[in-house]
């Protein structure tokens, strides 16, 4: 039974619900890609599906727009897969459980994937009918945007003719995005040596954090569970000796981690001291993040007594804790040109203990290329002193602001006519695929926009139905005037 069937715009909501029924997390996009190809075949549209699962669908201009300049509509097929503790959905095989309440669409206990499923839904609803006048369309649906914009980076853009691009990967109605930061993923690896640890085993956990997008929401000042764990372990070790067995935290380098866990082995009969110290640390941290992460919790739970437990050597553990405590995180510099815009930042998104090393995955962002390089150099220098290495991947360029943008001017005018107010024209401290396409297609005029969505990349993600409808009408009018 359809959950969204009674909502308008009906065909947009129809396709969004179908998309939500198909597993399409980053790295798992074959099924959603094939779905788009099947759609193109069914509607007798020219298409291209590459080896990465990117899909391009072409449609001729209609209703007098046959000879107009082509327009690209672009979004991504993959979603961030996050779920609440206790949720048994398998993102590899299961669809989402949609809910609607008071005009707000959510998914039960998981991310919704409105980012960027709504772009795909808009595109398919436009492609299936000749009801709406539009120029020739090039629908470009990329994969793995959420893990480094890998699809857009790999895409061969030579078949594309459009010099005007509408990106549908924004989450604030009335905001027109015209520039963004560049970024890169930095992988810190610290080698480990192990020995046998004796005593009682404890699980230290940091949980209850808000999390969020590591670019868009880095300015919120929210706590990072992995870095909090480094602080907890350092504070605990001041008073109570322990051996560190392993630590893990976070799921995506572009999401602020909401939880982290470490296992330690302590001398026997120290449980009371450990609980007291952890309670003090938890209280202090909770007070510091009362406004941003009111539910933050640090706990220590004793597990089965283990006579011999494999643990890191003291030297290895000290270096790991030092890295967590001293590697930079969060906002590094604000822009002087655009008030309120973060210029340079980084986020430790994934912390994982491997067989012979600890890996720390950072998302590094800046709208100034030299600052991005300087921040990477700082990380490399500190990591080198700890005996580790830093490698980078997924480097993508900043999307520079165009002084002369006919598309931006047109969209501002149409917005004022439709809404009775001026749109907010802004830059974003996050990577969007516009930067990749602008780097590949000379003289590309591009604007990103979309309906209202909140708490993306978290299980609280939501999408406003009325905003989806207004944005659909806005999109149709833009295409109508791009003759």
Predicted regions and their residues:
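Active-site-adjacent substrate-binding region
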Residues: 224-227, 231-247, 401-444
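Fold-level recognition of mixed alpha/beta catalytic cores in primary-metabolism enzymes, strongest
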Residues: 135-225, 233, 237
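His/Asp/Glu-rich mid-to-C-terminal helical/loop segments that flank catalytic regions of hydrolases
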Residues: 158, 222-239, 267-271, 318-325, ...
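Zn-dependent metallopeptidase/amidohydrolase metal-coordination segment
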Residues: 12, 336, 343-356, 422-477
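Active-site metal-coordination/substrate-binding segment of hydrolases
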Residues: 65-147, 152-163, 198-201, 314, ...
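Acidic-enriched catalytic cores of C-N bond-cleaving enzymes acting on peptides and small amides
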Residues: 195-199, 218-248, 268-345, 384
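A short beta-alpha structural unit
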Residues: 17-21, 263, 297-310, 347-351, ...
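Acidic/His- and Gly-rich active-site-bordering loop/insert found
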Residues: 3-104
């Amino acid at each position: 039974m359809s959950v969204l069937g009674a909502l308008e715009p009906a065909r947009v909501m129809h396709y969004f619900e179908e998309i939500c029924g198909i597993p399409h997390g980053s790295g798992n996009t074959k099924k959603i890609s094939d779905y788009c190809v099947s759609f193109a075949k069914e509607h007798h549209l020219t298409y291209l599906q590459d080896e990465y699962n990117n899909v391009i669908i072409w449609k001729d201009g209609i209703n007098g727009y046959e000879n107009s300049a082509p327009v690209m509509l672009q979004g991504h097929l993959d979603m961030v897969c996050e779920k609440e503790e206790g949720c048994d959905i398998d993102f590899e095989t299961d669809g989402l459980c949609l809910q609607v309440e008071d005009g707000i669409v959510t998914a039960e206990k998981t991310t919704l994937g409105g980012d960027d499923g709504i772009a795909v839904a808009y595109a398919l609803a436009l492609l299936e009918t000749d009801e709406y006048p539009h120029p020739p369309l090039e629908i470009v649906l990329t994969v793995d945007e959420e893990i480094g914009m890998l699809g857009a980076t790999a895409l061969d853009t030579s078949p594309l003719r459009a010099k005007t691009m509408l990106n549908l990967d924004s989450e604030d109605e009335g905001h027109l995005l015209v520039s963004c930061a560049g970024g890169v993923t930095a992988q810190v690896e610290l080698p480990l040596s192990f020995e046998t640890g004796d005593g009682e085993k404890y699980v230290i956990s940091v949980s209850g954090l808000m999390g969020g997008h590591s670019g868009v929401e880095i300015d919120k000042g929210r706590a990072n569970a992995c870095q909090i764990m480094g602080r907890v372990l350092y504070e605990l070790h001041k008073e109570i000796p322990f051996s560190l067995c392993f630590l893990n935290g976070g799921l995506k380098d572009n999401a602020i981690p909401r939880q982290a866990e470490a296992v330690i082995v302590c001398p026997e009969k120290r449980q009371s001291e450990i609980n007291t110290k952890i309670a003090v640390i938890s209280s202090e941290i909770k007070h510091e993040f009362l406004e941003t992460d009111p539910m933050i919790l640090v706990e220590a739970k004793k597990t089965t007594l283990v006579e011999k437990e494999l643990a890191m050597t003291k030297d290895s553990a000290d270096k790991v804790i030092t890295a967590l405590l001293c590697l930079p995180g969060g906002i590094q510099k604000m822009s002087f040109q655009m008030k309120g815009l973060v210029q340079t930042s980084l986020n430790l998104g994934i912390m994982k203990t491997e067989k012979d090393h600890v890996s720390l995955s950072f998302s590094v962002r800046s709208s100034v290329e030299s600052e991005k390089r300087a921040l990477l150099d700082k990380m490399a220098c500190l990591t080198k002193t700890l005996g580790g290495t830093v490698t980078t991947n997924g480097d993508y360029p900043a999307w520079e602001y165009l002084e002369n943008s006919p598309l931006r001017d047109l969209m501002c005018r149409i917005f004022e006519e439709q809404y009775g107010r001026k749109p907010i024209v802004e830059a974003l401290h996050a990577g969007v695929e516009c930067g990749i396409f602008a780097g590949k297609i000379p003289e590309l005029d591009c604007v990103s926009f979309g309906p209202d969505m909140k708490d993306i990349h978290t299980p609280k993600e939501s999408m406003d139905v009325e905003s989806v409808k207004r944005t659909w009408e806005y999109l149709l009018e833009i295409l109508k005037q791009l003759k």
